[in-house]
Amino acid sequence: MQTIYTKITDIKGNLITVEAEGARLGELAEIERVDGRSSYASVLRFDAKKVTLQVFGGTSGLSTGDRVIFLGRAMEVTYGESLIGRRLSGIGKPIDGEGECFGDPIAISTPTFNPVCRIVPRDMVRTNIPMIDMFNCLVKSQKIPIFSSSGENHNALLMRIAAQTDADIVIIGGMGLTFVDYSFFVEESKRLGFSDKCVMFIHKAVDAPVECVLIPDMALACAEKFAVDHNKNVLVLLTDMTAFADALKEIAITMDQIPANRGYPGSLYSDLALRYEKAVDIAKGGSITLISVTTMPGDDITHPVPDNTGFITEGQFYLKNNRIDPFGSLSRLKQLVIGKVTREDHGDLANSLIRLYADSRKAAERMAMGFKLSNWDKKLLAFAELFETRLMSLEVNIPLEEALDIGWKILAQSFHSEEVGIKEQLINKYWPKSCLHR
């Protein structure tokens, strides 16, 4: 039997305090208003009989005489095959105008996957973006952020990854989205043709902060069910984790918690890690690969959100000047697949290209300072132009094998074979014989 409480003692922002007994942390409650409307709330903390709840949708119109009913369960989301192709809000309600989703309710606050059932990652997730596939491979079950500078079009990059990946299902969690961003996600998913394998959980900038906090949990709970029950390889795309952290900060300030670095709660690291650690490759099952966008306010890599994220994840993609910067990017799992599930020349070729591109940057600096350029400097600058156009551009959409072939052609068009520092047996096998040296 559910107990009804009618003594709301405090209303502050999106929080209410009610005198109640037996409430549990994270428990869901229904609020029945005197005007007949109802809304949901989640227990954030309790002190003796004083229970603090975060109200979904805000407290506007709420009165101290409204009825609060604790439901005895945590927040749930509907899971089933009918979820594919749908768009849902931060509380799991459809927002695409296509009716209710049918399926089984599942809890969203579940522990990370049993480590005993995890296996060492061994497969590559293809994106057809050379700066990822060739230089910083995305590995199945990897958790990796995109550190985005101000003004970068990270949403377009996410949409390209979603459209070009070989994952079975793509789940997108959008947090703090403007209406323009939300419309872009919907239109691009249809234009690029992956809406039939995509699920979107969307929190808009005008929605309550608590709904923003729930988005990653809903996306990852559904991803885990697809991976475990249906052996699907799921790619989860979350944007923007800085908005997620800001929502945590807003809730913590409203609750009068003592702030830590730059006003963020002291639990920020744990809150981020709890979500990222859901990435998993399951023995005799599917997998969850997680890519998130973390915007850097003021391009500050030491900001608490990217700083904490870097300690949790397995590398990062650094988006700068509308390119994935090869010097700021790193995949800590790429050695598990390079040369093992990819071509034998992959590692040596990628290392040579990046080394020569780094040298070309130094040559560009010498040219900018008015130094006389050597013939080697001129070769490097010509190489850099080809490299940036044919491999670094985010508009390039080619499979890994073609990217490797293009890499060899760029080297052959710019240098003699003995100048690139690659093993002779690979040179003999892959160096284009038809290319003329310049």
From Swiss-Prot:
Pfam families: ATP-synt_ab (PF00006), ATP-synt_ab_N (PF02874), ATP-synt_VA_C (PF22919). This is V-type ATP synthase beta chain. Belongs to the ATPase alpha/beta chains family. NCBIfam families: PRK02118.1, PRK04196.1. The gene is atpB. GO terms for molecular function: ATP binding; proton-transporting ATP synthase activity, rotational mechanism. GO terms for biological process: proton motive force-driven plasma membrane ATP synthesis. Keywords: ATP synthesis, Hydrogen ion transport, Ion transport, Transport. CDD domains: ATP-synt_V_A-type_beta_N, V_A-ATPase_B. It comes from Chlamydia felis (strain Fe/C-56) (Chlamydophila felis). SUPFAM superfamilies: P-loop containing nucleoside triphosphate hydrolases. PANTHER family: V-TYPE PROTON ATPASE SUBUNIT B. Produces ATP from ADP in the presence of a proton gradient across the membrane. The V-type beta chain is a regulatory subunit.
